[in-house]
Amino acid sequence: MTKLTARQQQVFDLIRRAIERSGFPPTRAEIAAELGFSSPNAAEEHLRALARKGVIELAAGASRGIRLLGVDDAPHQFTLPHAALMQLSLPLVGRVAAGSPILAQEHISQHYACDPALFTSKPDYLLKVRGLSMRDAGILDGDLLAVQKRTEAKDGQIIVARLGDDVTVKRLMRRPGGLELIAENPDYENIFVKAGSADFALEGIAVGLIRSGEL
């Protein structure tokens, strides 16, 4: 890897940890808060320096548009030939009716053309977030969560799951006897799901986030 200054290495490591933990990179404001910068502009300067050194790629106009480059053991990231010139057409899922598939036509309100560099892996759809249970993970009411369809997930990943008739976004942790779905907001309770529960179904994992107004 290109030699980085101590501060640049801190920023790079923070981005990498955020992607490993949540599936998407931090915002400039989150980097500034975590590393004690005076403002998000200071974080932006370090990001531009990292981009010039070829270790990250920045997507213009997106607060989480950061992608790691040239890191052999980095989390898998979506790459395409000429990715900057290509667009993904992603369906936006709004409210989901009980008992029907998330990607049923009646749940899709529209499609968005998105730059693939915004995401850590190729997503299958965008889910409009409702509520603040994941606030401390930087996921706010009205955000669009990029989701990759999966039937399995690792501990610590942010997932989309069905619980009975509801669809929820939580952090997954395995516990003796089942799974714990962890809220990233102390005002909300965690949810324990017993092993083999027929009410639980994993719908996918978070691979990116688009703040309302960024598209």
Swiss-Prot record:
It is an enzyme of class 3 (hydrolase). Represses a number of genes involved in the response to DNA damage (SOS response), including recA and lexA. In the presence of single-stranded DNA, RecA interacts with LexA causing an autocatalytic cleavage which disrupts the DNA-binding part of LexA, leading to derepression of the SOS regulon and eventually DNA repair. NCBIfam families: lexA (TIGR00498). Belongs to the peptidase S24 family. The active site is at residues 133, 170. It comes from the Bacteria. Signal peptide: none annotated. It catalyses: Hydrolysis of Ala-|-Gly bond in repressor LexA. It comes from Burkholderia cenocepacia (strain ATCC BAA-245 / DSM 16553 / LMG 16656 / NCTC 13227 / J2315 / CF5610) (Burkholderia cepacia (strain J2315)). This is LexA repressor. Its EC number is 3.4.21.88. One of its GO terms (biological process) is DNA repair. HAMAP family: LexA. GO terms for molecular function: DNA binding; serine-type endopeptidase activity. Gene3D superfamilies: Umud Fragment, subunit A, Winged helix-like DNA-binding domain superfamily/Winged helix DNA-binding domain. Residues 28-48 bind DNA.
